[in-house]
Amino acid sequence: MSNNLLKGKKGIIFGALNDMSIAWKVAERAHEEGATFTLTNAPIAMRMGALNELAEKTNSQIIPADATSVEDLKNLFSQSQEILGGKIDFVLHSIGMSPNVRKKKDYTDLNYEWYKKTLDVSAMSLHKVLKVASETDAINEWGSVVALTYIAAQRIFPDYNDMADAKSLLESITRSFGYHYGTSNKVRVNTISQSPTVTTAGSGVSGFDKFIDFSENMSPLGNAGSLDCANYCISMFSDLTKYVTMQNLFHDGGFSSTGVTNAVMDRFGE
């Protein structure tokens, strides 16, 4: 169902890999709501995914870019404005990876070069996106930038490893840059802290299936799915949320405010 919430708006969507990706769902919903946008991912990620299929489905163009490269980002924003015919109204940052998680390194024994890579790709890339956008005046007033995060930024989930540190930095960048970008250009910057979601990236975390089951039982409304997250992103890109900025917005069925549930307690008696 379309309400034309994004009619006439132009955007850039980072991080769609395949139809399991939240970014993929956001692109589909943004298209349904009347937006035009470009799609981007790192060249190495594009070889692993099916971005061409999404581009065809949403009538979008793909611009490969390494989000850790300022030069790539300058080219991305420049080309996107040329393709879309004007400044950008919304950006989705859905980027995250950890070599330490992939290689199953213990948090107390991290490979520090991999650690720096995790922080650069998963968090500092947002700072670079915002820096390039602000310096080139690429985003319209009242534009919206949304980055996806996870509650492990604030609480311990052992197997989430150094990605938890990256998400903490991501949320801090959102607040800090959100202040400056709001003051100078009235651009809003927020993070959405999503329920554990079955994606290619999430599935790489040890014990992920068990944790999804736990989270489902710990959330009064149950886990929020990827489509529901996409719908929340659409609302954040729309004019209905013009005065929301510098926030970490939980989209998790109530998990973040729940100490314990009867469903979880009952399992201790089994």
Regions found by a protein language model. Name each.
Residues 3-40:
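Canonical Rossmann dinucleotide-binding motif of NAD(H)/NADP(H)-dependent dehydrogenases/reductases
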